[in-house]
Design a protein with these regions (language model features):
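Gram-negative outer-membrane beta-barrel transporters
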Residues: 464-471, 581-585, 601-690, 711-717, ...
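Structural signature of Gram-negative outer-membrane beta-barrels, strongest in the C-terminal barrel
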Residues: 291, 407-411, 415, 448-584, ...
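N-terminal periplasmic accessory domains that precede
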Residues: 97-102, 117-120, 132, 147-152, ...
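Face-selective signature of the C-terminal outer-membrane beta-barrel domain
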Residues: 287-304, 334-489, 512-514, 569-570, ...
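Short acidic/polar hinge/loop motifs at secondary-structure boundaries
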Residues: 137-164
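Transmembrane beta-barrel wall of Gram-negative outer-membrane proteins
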Residues: 199-228, 236-308, 339-346, 404
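Membrane-embedded beta-barrel scaffold of Gram-negative outer-membrane proteins
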Residues: 348-369, 512-514, 520-526, 554-615, ...
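C-terminal beta-signal and adjacent terminal beta-strands/loops
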Residues: 15-17, 235-236, 529, 584-586, ...
Length: 756
């Protein structure tokens, strides 16, 4: 049993996705809708879950090993970076429901409380965080986002989270850090398996089944995981009070009961309804051990994800018909589909210290359908719509080798990657609720896309200067090319967009100093190279809410300089870690308004706007009072500034980054019981003049949560969790987009695990 627990950041986000007494955010009213738990009782009678041990494993183990941070096995305390490990045991003990919540257990991570659960690390979203599964990139080729619900959390063995710029070893997407999700494989002969079943008051059902086995040199595994939820009314419908000419859009409409958005420019006229989500993943792995040191492993995952809004509501006395000109999608939202296949082939030779990986992530289906003006409430919301599809595909290959020469451990490697996407926009399809709906040819139907490829060489020398000093000296040379961009309308000749190439050397220099056996100091400096995303280069879109997004194939890569200074201290029952970090980005890419449409809506595109800066400090403290009680607290202060295109490109605050994050909690462990009570505070991020407590605000909020686990026996356990015990109401913005949402209220989840 481990004696100490280090801070577990964002534990409070563990159970929002499961059951709930739903809280409507419509007009301040609350609709308490009770749910039946008969299914869960049947589940408990028939099955169960993995056994719960006497104490949770620490998220960040000073004696733990990381194989990701420096591409070689090292103890986390010796690595000159903020490295954290989330273990399989902790994922189970904390009743984690999706991969984003697993990452949220790490210090410095902020996960929004939407169904998707976007991740923010030190002010960076997934566009600048490299996310891997068994070394295979999960960031989409289309826009670098990560579908966290499509990563099967029950199949995760551990998660390694490395904060700060890591481009010298991992390339352009690792500007803010990287996250590697490592999945399970059988270690011992025989067959093993697990079942996890859960139910909640959102009518949420989660189920996972897995089995693995080994026979001498051959190992295998299979898994299936799914999650279905009715969701809550997270997205409110709003419409501009005045049009572009200053005319009131609500003339003759009773607005006395309507609330406004945070900026006061729009009325809240309804909500899109509950957001129903279905995620499903299944796959297998095969491994063969040529010897104890030489292994070949193939892993395959197929994942399917869909969402839709149901039961939209209007807050207007005239229902969905007024004011005139409001697009149907304002009330009804859209429906989305995503399907991907992931292939991963890895060869690992511990004897000769050779590692090779080849992978492909293929989003065969990705897009959405938006209802058009023919969709009406009187016709059960049936009708036509417009369809946008943007499948994408990524390939990558990496090969490296290590040598040891005296006090030097040298790593040398190379990588190659290729991305592509193809977007199709059909202006009219017969049924907006069906992906396979009949396309009605329209002269404005559009096809566009593009490609990018890169290759790189990297080197790192770990130089053990003395028993106390170690230096890491290295760098990476990247060559990047964007090409094959095209754009054409139905019946028109294609327009070829410009191609270009860039190259960059990204150095990295770090030093670690052991003051004594219990205290380590480290200092790190590095540069990062981040090429523009394909959708920033080549995407064209006309959203249902108006306006237009135009491509910009002239974008240049961003370059970022990173500094970090930190300390890790073990004082027996108390552990302390602290760090300071700074990042400065040149040629920062941001979305800017470049004009107006004929109807006065914004025309936007991505541009290199200038500079962006982020700096901050992190402090984490844990203390163990006894074998039964332990506590933790951690605090993050961070500030982001960016060139503001609407203010003459002067530096201004980046309001998407919360300045203050605070987490604390207490754990009680007395076998067979384990109880965790956690809290989280996120500071407000509203722009000047914006009001809190309204839709489209980024509120400050405090959440209190509890998780209880009971081990029935060594194979069976039962868990019960409450998220947002105080039933706080708040509004926020998704971490990886410009979408706003109403936070979920009090949530309950009951689950059972059984292993064999």
């Amino acid at each position: 049993m481990p004696d100490y627990l280090l801070s577990i950041n964002n534990q409070v986000l563990l159970c929002y996705f499961i059951s709930k007494n739903s809280v409507s955010k419509s007009k301040g009213d609350k609709e308490m809708k009770s749910k039946k738990y008969g299914m869960m009782l049947a589940v408990l009678a028939a099955a169960g879950g993995v056994s719960v041990s006497a104490a949770p494993v620490p998220v960040y183990e000073l004696k733990g090993l990381t194989v990701t941070a420096t591409r070689q096995a090292e103890t986390t305390k010796d690595v000159p970076a903020n490295v954290q490990i989330v273990t399989e045991k902790e994922i189970k003990d904390r009743n984690v429901q999706n991969a984003a919540q697993a990452v949220a257990l790490a210090t410095g991570v902020h996960v929004d409380t939407t169904v998707e659960g976007s991740v923010n690390l030190r002010g960076y979203n997934s566009k600048n965080i490299l996310v891997l599964v068994d070394g295979q990139q999960m960031n989409t080729a289309w826009n670098s986002t990560v579908d966290w619900n499509m990563i099967p959390v029950e199949n995760i063995r551990k998660v390694e989270v490395v904060s700060g710029g890591q481009s010298a070893l991992y390339g352009g997407r690792a500007v803010g850090g990287f996250i590697n999700n490592m999945t399970k494989s059988a270690k011992e002969n025989g067959v093993h398996g697990a079942v996890n079943l859960g139910y909640g008051s959102h009518n949420t059902v989660k189920q996972s089944y897995m089995a693995s086995g080994r026979k001498d040199r051959l190992n295998w595994g299979i898994f299936y995981e799914s999650k279905i939820t009715d969701g809550w009314r997270s997205y409110l419908s709003s419409y501009a009070i005045k049009n572009s000419k200053g005319k009131n859009n609500f003339t003759g409409v009773d607005t006395s009961s309507l609330d406004t958005t945070a900026d006061g420019k729009e009325y809240i006229i309804g909500d899109r309804g509950k957001k129903e989500v279905m995620s499903e993943s299944y796959g297998f792995n095969l491994g063969y051990d040529f010897t104890e040191d030489r292994k070949l492993t193939y892993k395959f995952t197929h994942s399917n994800y869909t969402w839709k809004y149901t039961d939209p509501r209007s807050y207007l006395s005239a229902g969905f018909s007024k004011p005139s000109g409001v697009p149907a999608s304002t009330f009804f939202g859209n429906r989305g589909w995503r399907v991907y296949d992931m292939h991963s082939l890895t060869y690992n030779d511990q004897k000769d210290k050779i590692h090779a990986h080849f992978g492909m992530t293929d989003y065969t289906k990705s897009g959405y359908i938006t209802p058009d003006k023919t969709v009406k409430a009187s016709r059960t919301f049936d009708g036509a719509g417009s369809k946008t599809s943007y499948p994408s595909k990524s390939w990558d290959f990496d090969l490296n080798k290590r040598w040891t020469a005296g006090s030097h451990t040298i790593l040398f490697g190379g990588s190659y990657g290729k991305d592509r996407f193809d977007e199709t926009i059909y202006k009219t399809v017969s049924d907006w609720k069906s992906w396979d709906s009949t396309v009605k040819g329209n002269k404005d139907d559009q096809w566009l896309g593009g490609k990018a490829k890169s290759w790189a060489l990297y080197i790192q020398d770990k130089w053990k200067l003395s028993s106390r000093w170690a230096a890491y000296i290295g760098g990476r040379y990247d060559y990047y090319e964007k090409y094959g961009g095209y754009n054409y309308y139905r019946g028109k000749a294609p327009t070829r967009l410009e191609s270009d190439s860039y190259h960059q050397f990204s150095p990295k220099l770090s030093a670690s100093y052991a003051l004594d056996n219990h205290t380590n100091l480290y200092l790190s400096f590095g540069k990062s190279f981040a090429p523009p995303l394909l959708y920033q280069l080549y995407r064209y879109a006309e959203p249902s809410y108006g306006g237009r997004y135009e491509p910009n194939p002239s974008l240049k890569p961003e370059t970022t300089t990173n500094w970090e200074l930190g300390i890790k201290k073990d004082m027996g029952k108390t552990k302390i870690s602290a760090d300071l970090f700074y990042a400065r980005t040149k040629d920062y890419i941001d979305l800017v308004t470049i004009g107006k449409t004929a109807k006065g809506a914004d025309i936007k595109t991505y541009k290199n706007v200038g500079e962006a800066r982020t700096h901050g400090a992190e402090l984490s403290v844990t203390h163990k009072f006894s074998s039964l009680w332990s506590v933790y607290a951690n605090y993050t202060w961070q500030l982001g500034k960016v060139a503001d295109a609407d203010n003459g490109y002067a530096m201004g605050r980046d309001y998407e980054i919360p300045r203050h994050l605070f987490h604390s909690g207490v754990t009680y462990t007395n076998h067979p019981w384990t109880v965790n009570v956690d809290s989280m505070f996120v500071s407000a991020r509203n722009e000047p003049g914006w009001k809190s407590g309204k839709f489209k605000s980024r509120d400050a909020y405090f959440l209190l949560n509890m998780d209880t686990a009971y081990a029935v026996n060594k194979n069976l356990s039962v868990q019960f969790s409450i998220y947002n015990i105080l039933d706080r109401e708040y509004y926020d913005q998704e971490s990886a987009s410009d979408k706003y949402y109403a936070g979920d209220g009090r949530t309950f989840t009951l689950s059972a695990r059984y292993s064999f």
